[in-house]
């Protein structure tokens, strides 16, 4: 199945692909940090309450939500900007 994509569409898809790869890398980094932190805590015989972990996860969730919102806004702004450029080029050529 062949898809005919405009350069802008291809660029947006490439950016989403890169974002996906970056999020996967972030996930792996978080897992590694959690694992090393978990090992440190057990070696020091300290325990973290579930409430503390839950609060940290909520903070991370809020930050990720903000990043997602900013990304969506940036993509939307880029699409509008490109559309306006195309319209101005179209009106100038008439």
Swiss-Prot record:
Main location: nucleus
Biological function: Component of the DASH complex that connects microtubules with kinetochores and couples microtubule depolymerisation to chromosome movement; it is involved in retrieving kinetochores to the spindle poles before their re-orientation on the spindle in early mitosis and allows microtubule depolymerization to pull chromosomes apart and resist detachment during anaphase.
Pfam families: DASH_Dad3
Protein name: DASH complex subunit DAD3
Key words of the record: Cell cycle, Cell division, Centromere, Chromosome, Chromosome partition, Cytoplasm, Cytoskeleton, Kinetochore, Microtubule, Mitosis, Nucleus
Subcellular location: Nucleus; Cytoplasm, Cytoskeleton, Spindle; Chromosome, Centromere, Kinetochore; Chromosome
Matches recorded under InterPro entries: DASH_Dad3
Record bears the keyword Cytoplasm: yes
GO BP field: attachment of spindle microtubules to kinetochore; cell division; mitotic sister chromatid biorientation; positive regulation of attachment of spindle microtubules to kinetochore; positive regulation of microtubule polymerization; protein transport along microtubule to mitotic spindle pole body
Organism: Saccharomyces cerevisiae (strain ATCC 204508 / S288c)
Annotated S-S bridges: none
Assembly and interaction partners: Component of the DASH complex consisting of ASK1, DAD1, DAD2, DAD3, DAD4, DAM1, DUO1, HSK3, SPC19 and SPC34, with a stoichiometry of one copy of each subunit per complex. Multiple DASH complexes oligomerize to form a ring that encircles spindle microtubules and organizes the rod-like NDC80 complexes of the outer kinetochore. DASH complex oligomerization strengthens microtubule attachments. On cytoplasmic microtubules, DASH complexes appear to form patches instead of rings.
Entry's family note: Belongs to the DASH complex DAD3 family.
Additional remarks: Present with 468 molecules/cell in log phase SD medium.
GO cellular component, one term: microtubule
């Amino acid at each position: 199945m062949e898809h005919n994509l405009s350069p802008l569409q291809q660029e947006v898809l490439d950016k989403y692909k890169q974002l996906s790869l970056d999020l996967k890398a972030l996930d792996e980094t978080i897992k590694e940090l959690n694992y090393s932190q978990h090992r440190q805590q057990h070696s020091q015989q300290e325990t973290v309450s579930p409430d503390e972990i839950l609060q940290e996860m909520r903070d991370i969730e809020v930050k990720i939500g903000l990043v997602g919102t900013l990304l969506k806004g940036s993509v939307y702004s880029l699409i509008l900007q490109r559309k306006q450029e195309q319209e101005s080029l179209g009106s100038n050529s008439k």
